[in-house]
């Protein structure tokens, strides 16, 4: 069975051979072997509830369900239900329900905003309509937040996974400007652990004047 793959939020710059460079001095990385993300899987509390929630609130259809009493890769006894949701454009979001395991939690040392899944929508109109619809269903929504390249809203699914809906709003020249400073920013961060200011325009609003 062929499963769908990635959803590219922005057409990020590439190096000469299509792979992201290993560093600023090495613009010819190894030939990429990965074609795309096959699927992303998370744990869920209740597979049926999760499938219905994603279909109701995000319009994501259930692609298939897989259930076993043992883990195919290890043979370990561990009954599970594995569901696959259609995330659009050939992308799949999957979940495991593990009824014999301790209740799921999260990494308490990592802030709740950090680990999240971003899903693209086609317009600001769609983004704002989604916020209204989610809020009317009693789901707390943050945003829209302006990231210059895109605007986003944030909320949590029934399992505590943070979700982002993003609408591309990047202007000509933005990606090229970011591409020029990416390694300088990373190397400065590695030394100082303080946010470099090369791309402060993304969140201070000055991009509106810089990129017409």
Where are these regions (language model features)?
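Vicinal oxygen chelate
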Residues: 2-3, 7, 16, 23-32, 37-45, 84-88, 105-133, 151-156, ...
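Core segments of cupin and vicinal oxygen chelate
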Residues: 43-92
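A short, acidic/glycine-rich surface segment
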Residues: 69-73, 100-106
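Short glycine-/small-residue motifs
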Residues: 92-95, 165
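Histidine- and/or cysteine-centered catalytic micro-motif in compact active-site loops
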Residues: 98-100, 122
């Amino acid at each position: 069975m062929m499963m769908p793959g990635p959803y590219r939020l922005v057409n990020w710059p590439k190096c000469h051979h299509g792979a992201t460079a290993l560093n600023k001095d090495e613009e010819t990385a190894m030939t990429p072997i990965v074609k795309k993300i096959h699927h992303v899987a998370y744990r869920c509390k209740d597979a049926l509830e999760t499938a219905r929630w994603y279909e109701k609130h995000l319009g994501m259809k259930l692609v298939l369900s897989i259930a076993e009493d043992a883990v195919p890769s290890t043979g370990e006894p561990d009954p599970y239900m594995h569901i696959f949701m259609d995330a659009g454009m050939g992308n799949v979001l999957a979940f495991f329900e593990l009824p014999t395991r301790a209740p799921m939690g999260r990494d308490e040392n990592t802030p709740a905003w950090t680990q999240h899944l971003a899903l693209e929508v086609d317009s600001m109109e769609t983004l704002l309509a989604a916020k209204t619809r989610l809020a009317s269903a009693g789901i707390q929504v943050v945003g829209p937040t302006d990231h210059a390249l895109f605007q986003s809203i944030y909320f949590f699914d029934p399992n505590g996974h943070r979700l982002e809906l993003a609408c591309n709003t990047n202007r000509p020249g933005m990606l090229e400007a970011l591409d020029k400073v990416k390694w300088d920013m990373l190397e400065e961060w590695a030394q100082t652990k303080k946010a470099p200011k090369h791309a402060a325009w993304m969140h201070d609003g000055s991009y509106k004047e810089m990129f017409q």
